[in-house]
Amino acid sequence: MKRFHSHFNGYSVEFSPFEEQRLACVTSQHFGIIGNGRQYILDVLDRDIGAFKTFDTRDGLYDCTWSEENECHVASSSGDGSIKIWDTQAPSGGRPIKSFEEHTKEVYSVDWNLVTKDTFITGSWDQSIKIWNPRMDRSLKTFREHRYCIYSAIWSPRNAHLFASVSGDRTLKIWDSRDNRSLNTIKAHDHEILTCDWNKYNDKEVVTGSVDKTIRIWDIRYPDRPTTILRGHTYAVRRIKCSPHSESMLASCSYDMSVIVWDRAREQDPIIARMDHHTEFVVGLDWNMFIDGQMASCSWDEQVCVWNLGRPGQFR
């Protein structure tokens, strides 16, 4: 397992959609409560992980996403309500090429549209979701229905207009960006929902993770009950990522300091790997779309970790 010391507390990691060795990571001082933030651009090398570029901010950073149309651009969301676009060709320590400042509270989620490639979406503690084009000065559209902090807003990987959002109000909402109101509201958990993701192979399936320690898989056409409930974490599920290489596999990380890889096709024993390589809350997680089985995580223990599970077939 390769490790990188981030000096600040980790919050999110994402592999580049253009370069297989490149990884973005956002971090915050003092657990994101107060202090500065740092956007890292890292390279996963043969023996270790090296810092390619670093960009500092005056407030903590909570999430990041790579542009789908420019391999040198990455967006990060901040505790001061701003979203910043960075150019990785600029020198370390440089200023963002763009800063959007409409949200009035922390922005906990940012996600680039995989289909149109020219928009991204943000979810904020101000209870709003916004869609942006990086070339425009203002947001394209704002959605307000959630009644508490929004923790995650994620585009469908197959439909240009669909996105999902989850909130502390315990609901999962499905939206069409062309409409002003959500298409569906699912009371998905009995406690706050901290994360969601779409199945990369099934645009009718969304996965949610909650403070109630469970992961629930939903067919959005049949919202009355989840199709599957996965249990294995002992504290809140902080982030979920569906595999880009397998319809039935997903990974989760938790405040129990673990990362679990699941194959829900194995109904009796869905956990295929449990990793306890962190010593604090694990809050960031991603799969490398270029290298089957390669994953990255980041934690409040100031460690960014990259490891390789091998091909998913070996676990079946």
UniProtKB/Swiss-Prot annotation:
Coiled coil: none annotated. It comes from the Eukaryota. Interacts with PEX5; interaction only takes place when PEX7 is associated with cargo proteins. This is Peroxisomal targeting signal 2 receptor. Keywords: Cytoplasm, Peroxisome, Protein transport, Repeat, Transport, WD repeat. Receptor required for the peroxisomal import of proteins containing a C-terminal PTS2-type peroxisomal targeting signal. Specifically binds to cargo proteins containing a PTS2 peroxisomal targeting signal in the cytosol. Cargo protein-binding triggers interaction with PEX5 and formation of a ternary complex composed of PEX5 and PEX7 along with PTS2-containing cargo proteins, which is tranlocated into peroxisomes by passing through the PEX13-PEX14 docking complex. One of its GO terms (biological process) is protein import into peroxisome matrix. The gene is pex7. It is found in: Cytoplasm, Cytosol; Peroxisome matrix. The keyword Nucleotide-binding does not apply. It comes from Dictyostelium discoideum. One of its GO terms (cellular component) is cytosol. PROSITE patterns: WD_REPEATS_1 (PS00678), WD_REPEATS_2 (PS50082), WD_REPEATS_REGION (PS50294). Transmembrane segments: none annotated. Its main location: cytoplasm.
